Protein backbone atom coordinates (compact mmCIF):
# COMPACT_ATOMS: atom_id res chain seq x y z
CA UNK A 1 0.00 0.00 0.00
CA UNK A 2 1.38 3.42 -0.95
CA UNK A 3 0.28 6.87 0.16
CA UNK A 4 0.26 9.26 -2.78
CA UNK A 5 -1.10 12.82 -3.07
CA UNK A 6 -4.87 12.48 -2.91
CA UNK A 7 -6.38 9.02 -2.37
CA UNK A 8 -4.69 5.94 -0.94
CA UNK A 9 -3.58 3.68 -3.77
CA UNK A 10 -2.88 -0.04 -3.63
CA UNK A 11 -0.10 -0.93 -6.04
CA UNK A 12 -0.69 -4.59 -6.82
CA UNK A 13 2.10 -6.26 -8.81
CA UNK A 14 0.86 -8.31 -11.75
CA UNK A 15 4.42 -9.26 -12.68
CA UNK A 16 7.88 -7.92 -12.04
CA UNK A 17 7.28 -5.21 -14.61
CA UNK A 18 3.54 -4.43 -14.47
CA UNK A 19 1.28 -3.28 -11.65
CA UNK A 20 -2.40 -2.54 -11.14
CA UNK A 21 -3.33 0.68 -9.28
CA UNK A 22 -6.45 0.40 -7.12
CA UNK A 23 -8.04 3.33 -5.28
CA UNK A 24 -8.67 2.53 -1.62
CA UNK A 25 -11.34 4.55 0.19
CA UNK A 26 -10.81 3.11 3.66
CA UNK A 27 -8.50 0.69 5.46
CA UNK A 28 -10.65 -1.39 7.82
CA UNK A 29 -8.00 -3.69 9.28
CA UNK A 30 -4.26 -4.27 9.09
CA UNK A 31 -2.46 -7.11 10.83
CA UNK A 32 0.90 -8.78 10.46
CA UNK A 33 0.38 -12.46 11.16
CA UNK A 34 3.07 -15.07 11.59
CA UNK A 35 2.90 -15.69 7.84
CA UNK A 36 1.89 -12.52 5.98
CA UNK A 37 0.51 -9.00 6.09
CA UNK A 38 -3.30 -9.02 6.08
CA UNK A 39 -5.44 -6.05 5.10
CA UNK A 40 -9.16 -5.56 4.68
CA UNK A 41 -10.00 -2.42 2.71
CA UNK A 42 -12.86 -0.67 0.97
CA UNK A 43 -12.01 -0.01 -2.67
CA UNK A 44 -13.73 2.31 -5.10
CA UNK A 45 -14.28 -0.14 -7.95
CA UNK A 46 -14.33 -3.57 -6.30
CA UNK A 47 -15.95 -3.00 -2.91
CA UNK A 48 -14.53 -4.57 0.23
CA UNK A 49 -11.42 -6.63 -0.39
CA UNK A 50 -9.04 -9.00 1.37
CA UNK A 51 -5.37 -8.32 0.61
CA UNK A 52 -2.46 -10.58 1.54
CA UNK A 53 1.07 -9.23 1.07
CA UNK A 54 -0.22 -6.59 -1.38
CA UNK A 55 -2.14 -9.10 -3.53
CA UNK A 56 -5.93 -8.91 -3.66
CA UNK A 57 -7.35 -12.32 -2.79
CA UNK A 58 -11.07 -11.55 -3.06
CA UNK A 59 -13.31 -8.53 -3.47
CA UNK A 60 -17.05 -8.20 -2.99
CA UNK A 61 -17.92 -7.11 -6.52
CA UNK A 62 -16.18 -9.90 -8.45
CA UNK A 63 -15.45 -12.74 -6.00
CA UNK A 64 -18.29 -14.82 -7.44
CA UNK A 65 -16.42 -15.07 -10.75
CA UNK A 66 -13.44 -16.58 -8.95
CA UNK A 67 -15.08 -18.77 -6.32
CA UNK A 68 -17.90 -20.16 -8.45
CA UNK A 69 -15.43 -21.03 -11.22
CA UNK A 70 -13.11 -22.71 -8.75
CA UNK A 71 -15.76 -24.77 -6.96
CA UNK A 72 -18.66 -25.70 -9.19
CA UNK A 73 -17.02 -27.31 -12.25
CA UNK A 74 -15.55 -29.98 -9.96
CA UNK A 75 -18.60 -30.27 -7.72
CA UNK A 76 -21.03 -30.55 -10.63
CA UNK A 77 -18.83 -32.98 -12.56
CA UNK A 78 -18.89 -35.35 -9.59
CA UNK A 79 -22.34 -36.99 -9.43
CA UNK A 80 -22.55 -37.06 -5.62
CA UNK A 81 -19.75 -35.30 -3.71
CA UNK A 82 -20.15 -36.11 0.00
CA UNK A 83 -16.77 -35.34 1.56
CA UNK A 84 -14.89 -32.25 0.41
CA UNK A 85 -11.49 -30.92 1.46
CA UNK A 86 -10.60 -27.25 0.95
CA UNK A 87 -6.98 -26.16 1.32
CA UNK A 88 -6.78 -22.40 1.90
CA UNK A 89 -9.79 -20.21 1.29
CA UNK A 90 -9.55 -18.36 4.60
CA UNK A 91 -12.24 -15.81 3.76
CA UNK A 92 -14.81 -18.61 3.68
CA UNK A 93 -16.24 -18.01 0.21
CA UNK A 94 -15.03 -21.33 -1.20
CA UNK A 95 -16.57 -23.08 1.79
CA UNK A 96 -19.78 -21.14 1.16
CA UNK A 97 -19.99 -22.37 -2.43
CA UNK A 98 -19.20 -25.99 -1.51
CA UNK A 99 -21.96 -26.03 1.10
CA UNK A 100 -24.53 -25.00 -1.51
CA UNK A 101 -24.46 -28.64 -2.65
CA UNK A 102 -26.81 -30.66 -0.40
CA UNK A 103 -24.95 -33.86 -1.23
CA UNK A 104 -22.08 -32.60 0.94
CA UNK A 105 -22.04 -34.22 4.37
CA UNK A 106 -18.73 -32.76 5.54
CA UNK A 107 -16.58 -29.93 4.18
CA UNK A 108 -13.18 -29.59 5.83
CA UNK A 109 -11.45 -26.23 5.33
CA UNK A 110 -7.76 -26.12 6.24
CA UNK A 111 -5.98 -22.75 6.37
CA UNK A 112 -2.55 -22.11 7.81
CA UNK A 113 -3.33 -18.58 8.99
CA UNK A 114 -5.91 -18.27 11.74
CA UNK A 115 -5.62 -14.49 11.59
CA UNK A 116 -7.03 -14.50 8.05
CA UNK A 117 -10.00 -16.56 9.20
CA UNK A 118 -10.56 -14.37 12.26
CA UNK A 119 -10.47 -11.09 10.31
CA UNK A 120 -12.66 -12.56 7.56
CA UNK A 121 -15.29 -13.61 10.08
CA UNK A 122 -15.36 -10.06 11.43
CA UNK A 123 -14.96 -7.90 8.33
CA UNK A 124 -16.06 -10.04 5.35
CA UNK A 125 -19.56 -11.35 6.18
CA UNK A 126 -20.64 -11.13 2.54
CA UNK A 127 -17.83 -13.54 1.67
CA UNK A 128 -18.50 -16.35 4.12
CA UNK A 129 -22.24 -15.72 4.69
CA UNK A 130 -22.14 -17.78 7.86
CA UNK A 131 -20.47 -20.81 6.26
CA UNK A 132 -17.99 -21.13 9.13
CA UNK A 133 -20.89 -21.89 11.48
CA UNK A 134 -22.49 -24.62 9.38
CA UNK A 135 -22.75 -28.00 11.15
CA UNK A 136 -21.42 -29.54 7.94
CA UNK A 137 -18.25 -27.42 8.09
CA UNK A 138 -15.03 -28.26 9.91
CA UNK A 139 -12.44 -25.46 10.04
CA UNK A 140 -8.87 -26.50 10.80
CA UNK A 141 -6.07 -23.98 11.38
CA UNK A 142 -3.03 -25.89 10.21
CA UNK A 143 -0.49 -26.17 7.43
CA UNK A 144 -2.22 -27.98 4.58
CA UNK A 145 0.90 -30.05 3.98
CA UNK A 146 0.77 -31.37 7.55
CA UNK A 147 -2.98 -31.96 7.43
CA UNK A 148 -2.83 -33.98 4.21
CA UNK A 149 0.00 -36.15 5.55
CA UNK A 150 -1.99 -36.92 8.69
CA UNK A 151 -5.22 -37.51 6.77
CA UNK A 152 -3.44 -40.12 4.64
CA UNK A 153 -2.08 -41.83 7.74
CA UNK A 154 -5.60 -41.91 9.21
CA UNK A 155 -7.11 -43.31 6.01
CA UNK A 156 -9.36 -40.31 5.34
CA UNK A 157 -11.02 -40.17 1.94
CA UNK A 158 -12.60 -37.31 -0.01
CA UNK A 159 -14.67 -37.02 -3.16
CA UNK A 160 -13.42 -33.55 -4.09
CA UNK A 161 -10.31 -31.61 -3.03
CA UNK A 162 -10.19 -27.88 -3.77
CA UNK A 163 -6.91 -25.97 -3.50
CA UNK A 164 -7.67 -22.29 -2.93
CA UNK A 165 -4.15 -21.20 -2.06
CA UNK A 166 -2.04 -18.13 -2.66
CA UNK A 167 -0.31 -18.12 -6.05
CA UNK A 168 2.73 -20.39 -6.47
CA UNK A 169 4.85 -17.32 -7.25
CA UNK A 170 3.44 -14.65 -4.89
CA UNK A 171 4.14 -16.31 -1.54
CA UNK A 172 6.50 -18.82 0.01
CA UNK A 173 3.70 -20.29 2.13
CA UNK A 174 2.04 -22.41 -0.54
CA UNK A 175 4.90 -23.36 -2.88
CA UNK A 176 5.35 -26.88 -1.53
CA UNK A 177 1.64 -27.55 -2.10
CA UNK A 178 1.99 -27.20 -5.87
CA UNK A 179 4.63 -29.89 -6.39
CA UNK A 180 4.03 -33.22 -8.13
CA UNK A 181 4.79 -34.99 -4.86
CA UNK A 182 2.08 -33.13 -2.98
CA UNK A 183 -0.45 -33.51 -5.80
CA UNK A 184 0.26 -37.23 -5.61
CA UNK A 185 -0.74 -37.14 -1.95
CA UNK A 186 -3.95 -35.33 -2.90
CA UNK A 187 -4.68 -38.03 -5.47
CA UNK A 188 -4.24 -40.70 -2.80
CA UNK A 189 -6.73 -38.90 -0.54
CA UNK A 190 -9.43 -39.19 -3.20
CA UNK A 191 -11.91 -41.99 -3.63
CA UNK A 192 -11.72 -43.91 -6.91
CA UNK A 193 -13.87 -41.41 -8.80
CA UNK A 194 -12.53 -38.32 -7.05
CA UNK A 195 -11.71 -34.90 -8.45
CA UNK A 196 -9.24 -32.20 -7.44
CA UNK A 197 -9.01 -28.63 -8.66
CA UNK A 198 -6.50 -25.89 -8.00
CA UNK A 199 -6.15 -22.28 -8.90
CA UNK A 200 -2.83 -21.89 -10.71
CA UNK A 201 -2.17 -18.16 -10.90
CA UNK A 202 -1.71 -16.59 -14.31
CA UNK A 203 -0.25 -18.37 -17.32
CA UNK A 204 0.58 -15.17 -19.23
CA UNK A 205 2.78 -13.43 -16.67
CA UNK A 206 4.11 -16.57 -14.99
CA UNK A 207 4.18 -19.36 -17.60
CA UNK A 208 6.93 -21.35 -15.85
CA UNK A 209 5.00 -21.53 -12.57
CA UNK A 210 1.80 -22.42 -14.41
CA UNK A 211 3.50 -25.19 -16.38
CA UNK A 212 4.98 -26.56 -13.14
CA UNK A 213 1.50 -26.93 -11.65
CA UNK A 214 0.06 -28.32 -14.88
CA UNK A 215 2.82 -30.93 -15.08
CA UNK A 216 2.22 -31.90 -11.45
CA UNK A 217 -1.47 -32.54 -12.09
CA UNK A 218 -0.85 -34.36 -15.38
CA UNK A 219 1.64 -36.65 -13.65
CA UNK A 220 -1.06 -37.87 -11.26
CA UNK A 221 -4.44 -37.78 -13.02
CA UNK A 222 -5.71 -39.46 -16.21
CA UNK A 223 -8.18 -36.63 -16.90
CA UNK A 224 -6.89 -33.04 -16.80
CA UNK A 225 -8.83 -29.94 -17.79
CA UNK A 226 -7.45 -26.39 -17.98
CA UNK A 227 -9.68 -23.34 -17.84
CA UNK A 228 -9.55 -19.68 -16.87
CA UNK A 229 -11.77 -16.72 -16.07
CA UNK A 230 -11.20 -12.97 -16.05
CA UNK A 231 -11.11 -11.43 -12.57
CA UNK A 232 -11.28 -7.61 -12.80
CA UNK A 233 -9.69 -6.94 -9.40
CA UNK A 234 -6.78 -9.26 -10.26
CA UNK A 235 -6.13 -7.48 -13.55
CA UNK A 236 -5.83 -10.77 -15.42
CA UNK A 237 -7.47 -14.11 -16.14
CA UNK A 238 -6.86 -16.58 -13.33
CA UNK A 239 -6.10 -20.14 -14.37
CA UNK A 240 -7.55 -23.32 -12.92
CA UNK A 241 -6.40 -26.91 -13.39
CA UNK A 242 -8.77 -29.80 -12.67
CA UNK A 243 -7.59 -33.37 -12.26
CA UNK A 244 -10.06 -36.26 -12.24
CA UNK A 245 -9.72 -39.99 -11.70
CA UNK A 246 -12.83 -40.79 -13.74
CA UNK A 247 -15.22 -38.03 -14.82
CA UNK A 248 -14.38 -35.48 -17.52
CA UNK A 249 -15.89 -32.00 -17.02
CA UNK A 250 -15.46 -31.29 -20.73
CA UNK A 251 -17.98 -34.04 -21.51
CA UNK A 252 -20.84 -32.34 -19.66
CA UNK A 253 -23.26 -30.44 -21.92
CA UNK A 254 -24.76 -27.19 -20.69
CA UNK A 255 -28.16 -28.80 -20.19
CA UNK A 256 -26.76 -31.45 -17.85
CA UNK A 257 -24.87 -28.86 -15.81
CA UNK A 258 -28.03 -26.79 -15.42
CA UNK A 259 -30.01 -29.90 -14.48
CA UNK A 260 -27.54 -30.87 -11.76
CA UNK A 261 -27.52 -27.33 -10.37
CA UNK A 262 -31.33 -27.26 -10.36
CA UNK A 263 -31.67 -30.74 -8.85
CA UNK A 264 -29.35 -29.72 -6.02
CA UNK A 265 -30.96 -26.32 -5.59
CA UNK A 266 -27.65 -24.53 -6.16
CA UNK A 267 -28.06 -20.82 -6.85
CA UNK A 268 -25.20 -18.99 -8.56
CA UNK A 269 -24.51 -15.51 -9.88
CA UNK A 270 -21.97 -16.37 -12.59
CA UNK A 271 -21.63 -20.11 -13.14
CA UNK A 272 -24.24 -21.76 -15.38
CA UNK A 273 -24.32 -24.56 -17.91
CA UNK A 274 -23.35 -22.15 -20.67
CA UNK A 275 -20.54 -20.75 -18.53
CA UNK A 276 -19.28 -24.28 -17.82
CA UNK A 277 -19.06 -25.17 -21.50
CA UNK A 278 -17.44 -21.81 -22.30
CA UNK A 279 -14.85 -22.24 -19.54
CA UNK A 280 -13.94 -25.73 -20.74
CA UNK A 281 -13.47 -24.53 -24.32
CA UNK A 282 -11.45 -21.36 -23.74
CA UNK A 283 -7.79 -21.31 -24.76
CA UNK A 284 -5.07 -20.75 -22.18
CA UNK A 285 -3.52 -17.29 -22.47
CA UNK A 286 0.20 -17.48 -23.15
CA UNK A 287 2.71 -14.97 -24.41
CA UNK A 288 3.04 -15.00 -28.19
CA UNK A 289 6.69 -14.28 -28.90
Curated annotation (Swiss-Prot):
GO cellular component: cytoplasm
InterPro entries: PABS, PABS_CS, SAM-dependent_MTases_sf, Spermi_synthase, Spermidine_synt_N, Spermidine_synt_N_sf
EC number per UniProt: 2.5.1.16
Reaction equations catalysed: S-adenosyl 3-(methylsulfanyl)propylamine + putrescine = S-methyl-5'-thioadenosine + spermidine + H(+)
Disulphide-bridged cysteine pairs: none
Pathway as given in its UniProt record: Amine and polyamine biosynthesis; spermidine biosynthesis; spermidine from putrescine: step 1/1
Catalytic residues of the enzyme: 164
Keywords associated with the record: Cytoplasm, Polyamine biosynthesis, Spermidine biosynthesis, Transferase
Stored Pfam families: Spermine_synt_N, Spermine_synth
Ranges where the PABS domain occurs: 5-245
UniProt: S-methyl-5'-thioadenosine binding residues: 36, 111, 143-144
Gene Ontology MF term list: spermidine synthase activity
GO biological process: spermidine biosynthetic process
Subcellular location: Cytoplasm
SUPFAM superfamilies, A to Z: S-adenosyl-L-methionine-dependent methyltransferases
Residues annotated to bind spermidine: 67, 91
Predominant subcellular localization, coarse grouping: cytoplasm
Subunit structure comment from the entry: Homodimer or homotetramer.
Known role: Catalyzes the irreversible transfer of a propylamine group from the amino donor S-adenosylmethioninamine (decarboxy-AdoMet) to putrescine (1,4-diaminobutane) to yield spermidine.
Protein family membership: Belongs to the spermidine/spermine synthase family.
Protein name per Swiss-Prot or TrEMBL: Polyamine aminopropyltransferase
Species for this entry: Pyrobaculum arsenaticum (strain DSM 13514 / JCM 11321 / PZ6)
Amino acid sequence: MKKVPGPIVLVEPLSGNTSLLIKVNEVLAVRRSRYQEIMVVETEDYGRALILDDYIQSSYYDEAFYHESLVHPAMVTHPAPRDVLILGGGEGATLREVLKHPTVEKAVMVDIDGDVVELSKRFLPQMHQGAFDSPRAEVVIEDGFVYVKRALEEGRKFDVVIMDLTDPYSSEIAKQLYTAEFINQIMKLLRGDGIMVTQAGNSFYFPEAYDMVLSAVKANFPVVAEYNVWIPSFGYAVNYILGSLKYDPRALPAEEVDKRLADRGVKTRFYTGRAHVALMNMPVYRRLR
